[in-house]
């Protein structure tokens, strides 16, 4: 994998879990050239942000992107690197016109890093591959398609308290072998609610043929999410608790045929396992996984197996890890919460995984 201009290896970058706001803005705010009222640009009175807007440019770079002024807060006082004004202007033009996906240069005053992947780079097992798969999953979920990830072509990473990836990948429709260039903007967010891993998407789309004509990038609307899906992740629900629960109609016990039909349940399970063992191994080291039981809970008005189609849902998954990094096969429990705000391309996935003997 080749990094353009003074690479920063992803493995060497850690996400701070002490910062609760990244200060990113959306495309429409960028074009408006000023903060819209009520957009939450200042957080003096807000200590409990639930969802972050990652998008592709920070507030500090707003004036630079629009007026090409020197970036505010991005230059190290001890950094003597001089940026060619023409190169800087081209850099921000590429960001603006491609929504942050097609950037082939880097300037030392920006925190954006550009990576081009070789055909043999296997990124499915690291966080970039996971984010690409999540983005494609949500595109399929919303479009009713069945595209499969072939490989990641390139990605841009941006660290500003959170790690955001603008990923360009190749996908295929196995029904007719049609190939597509897929784009997704995914953020690995700070963990706030007793979860092990939190992933948010803002863009999940086929690359537009003409730059600037794709799905519009919009901020997350936290107010649109039901309060029941906010706060800390719920505790594991036992069969005894379920039997005495007054809201049994909100639950559905997933059948084996459902698991085969909805392969994203396997994806959720793999990511949950990854969140437990991250740092010890790559995702491919913990598969295959054997799903033993899945219970889905939602307040949305779906009957029986249709509950799997709910945008807002909580999944209780018990599974066995065959290739655990320490010792023999182990049984696990995972809690996965999926929330949406009604904006196309937006989904938030929170993962918590436990060993059953802990």
Swiss-Prot record:
Question: Which spans does this entry mark as compositional bias, Basic and acidic residues?
Answer: 58-67
Which positions carry the signal peptide feature in this UniProt record? none
Source species, domain of life: Eukaryota
| Pfam families cross-referenced by the UniProt entry | protein_MS5
In terms of InterPro entries, this protein maps to:
MS5
Q: Where is this region: Disordered?
A: 31-82
- Cross-referenced PANTHER family, in alphabetical order? CYSTATIN DOMAIN PROTEIN (PTHR31260:SF28), CYSTATIN/MONELLIN SUPERFAMILY PROTEIN (PTHR31260)
What protein family does this chain belong to?
Belongs to the UPF0725 (EMB2204) family.
Indicate what this protein is called per its UniProt record. Answer: UPF0725 protein At4g29550
| Protein source organism | Arabidopsis thaliana
